[in-house]
């Protein structure tokens, strides 16, 4: 039997959940097998992310991706024809070399990632395996999920500076049972917000976007909703935040402008401590300091690493070199993993391996601009990612990922393990 090789790589411009253009890629093998992938994009982006190539000009507000599409259909297609789709490192290395820039700025990370993901999907189909099994083998775990149910910052047009308020099931049950708890709290939260007099319109990630006065009010609403849904805060359902501090950090004065206050590093830590003391079910914070505020992040890590999970997003941008730097500096204790921040499946896996090797937890993440693509659901299971965040249990581009996880759990059977919150974080 002849070994299948890549016969054709084709891309087209489609649209994401925010109505912005993005890239869809089809990789066709010599035996007719086709793998497909759709690339997400972020609203809150780190300075060191791989370059998402946009066309500029007047068409579609300058956000068109036809240049990236054309790069796939010409240069990348020509370079990958005849290559083995099962050799993911070689596929990705070929595209990186072809691009020739340190940030994938010539061909576009959105072009390269689409091909990288679609190739993995084609290879899995060629092996007659689901993607999670092809990438991950046999020793698999279902991830613990984090759900952004109150949106602020860059994800909503309201007065809340902190970007995401998430809930996560910590009771040791099946993924389905945990997700049902989340759905119950989500619907309860809607009523709680209505009773508080707030609008319940949705933000980019399916969470509510009430025009609240401050973050404390958002946390109180979550706390009340958990209880009213019949659960115990911290025991059944916990809370996590993505602070996205780079978006309220002022580069001119080197301080944090948060909720009408101007705070130093130390004062910001005091602000966080107040929230942690008032809401002990708050167990994880992402990007509590600006991505360039190394001193602030390191000091916060030193004083809080045994109390909460400190997730690095903009600080490392899923880049193994930046993660290695953060590890040596002593910043954070967990890595947020976004495929489109680095731009290939292979490099993403490298960052995950480096995280694990150094005792950092990993959280696989969606982006605010999503599609119906479910790659990250399979990916989170395949790499035993431990944690996954993909928005609220609302809006189809978010729920698609969770529905895919329900399918995977059904396929794996009840004998498979469920990943829970890391043991090094004390929920008491």
UniProtKB/Swiss-Prot annotation:
EC class of the enzyme, as a word: lyase
GO molecular function, one term: phosphopyruvate hydratase activity
Secretion signal span: none
InterPro entries linked to this entry: Enolase, Enolase-like_C_sf, Enolase-like_N, Enolase_C, Enolase_CS, Enolase_N
EC number(s) recorded for this UniProt protein: 4.2.1.11
GO terms (BP aspect): glycolytic process
Job description of the protein: Catalyzes the reversible conversion of 2-phosphoglycerate (2-PG) into phosphoenolpyruvate (PEP). It is essential for the degradation of carbohydrates via glycolysis.
Protein family: Belongs to the enolase family.
Descriptive protein name: Enolase 1
Species per Swiss-Prot/TrEMBL record: Lactobacillus gasseri (strain ATCC 33323 / DSM 20243 / BCRC 14619 / CIP 102991 / JCM 1131 / KCTC 3163 / NCIMB 11718 / NCTC 13722 / AM63)
Lineage: Bacteria, Bacillati, Bacillota, Bacilli, Lactobacillales
């Amino acid at each position: 039997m002849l070994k299948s090789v890549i016969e054709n790589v084709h891309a087209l411009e489609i649209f994401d959940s925010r109505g912005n253009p993005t890239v869809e890629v089809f990789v066709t093998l010599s035996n007719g097998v086709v793998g497909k992938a759709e690339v997400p994009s972020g609203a809150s982006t780190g300075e060191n992310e791989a370059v998402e190539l946009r066309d500029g000009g007047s068409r579609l507000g300058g956000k068109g991706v036809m240049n990236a599409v054309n790069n796939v259909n010409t240069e990348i297609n020509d370079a990958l024809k005849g290559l083995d789709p099962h050799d993911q490192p070689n596929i990705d290395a070929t595209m990186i070399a072809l691009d020739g820039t340190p940030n994938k700025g010539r061909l576009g990370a959105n072009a390269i990632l689409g091909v990288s993901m679609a190739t993995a999907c084609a290879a899995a189909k060629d092996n007659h395996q689901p993607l999670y099994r092809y990438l991950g083998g046999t020793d698999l775990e279902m991830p613990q999920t984090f759900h952004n149910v109150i949106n602020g910052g860059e994800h909503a047009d309201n007065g809340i500076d902190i970007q995401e308020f998430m809930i996560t099931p910590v009771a040791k049950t099946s993924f389905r049972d945990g997700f049902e708890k989340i759905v119950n709290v989500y619907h309860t939260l809607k009523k709680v917000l209505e009773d508080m007099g707030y609008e319940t319109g949705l933000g980019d990630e399916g969470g509510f976007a009430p025009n609240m006065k401050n973050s404390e009010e958002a946390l109180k609403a979550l706390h009340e909703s958990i209880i009213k849904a019949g659960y115990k805060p911290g025991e059944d359902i916990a809370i996590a935040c993505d602070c996205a501090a780079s978006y309220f950090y002022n580069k001119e004065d080197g301080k944090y402008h948060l909720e009408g206050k101007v705070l130093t590093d130390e004062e910001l830590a005091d602000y966080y401590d107040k929230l942690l003391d008032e809401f002990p079910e708050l167990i994880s914070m992402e990007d509590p300091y600006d991505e360039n505020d190394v001193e602030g992040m390191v000091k916060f890590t030193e004083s809080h690493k045994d109390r909460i999970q400190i997730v690095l997003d903009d600080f490392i941008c899923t880049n193994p070199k930046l993660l290695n730097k953060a590890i040596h500096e002593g910043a954070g204790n967990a890595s947020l993993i976004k495929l489109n921040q680095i731009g290939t499946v292979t490099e993403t896996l490298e960052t995950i391996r480096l995280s694990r090797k150094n005792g950092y937890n990993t959280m696989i993440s969606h982006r605010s601009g999503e599609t119906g693509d479910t790659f990250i659901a399979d990916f989170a299971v395949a790499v035993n990612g431990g944690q996954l965040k993909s928005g609220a249990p609302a809006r189809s581009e978010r729920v698609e990922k969770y529905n895919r996880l329900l399918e995977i759990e059904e396929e794996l059977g009840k004998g498979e393990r469920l990943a829970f919150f890391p043991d090094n974080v004390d929920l008491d």
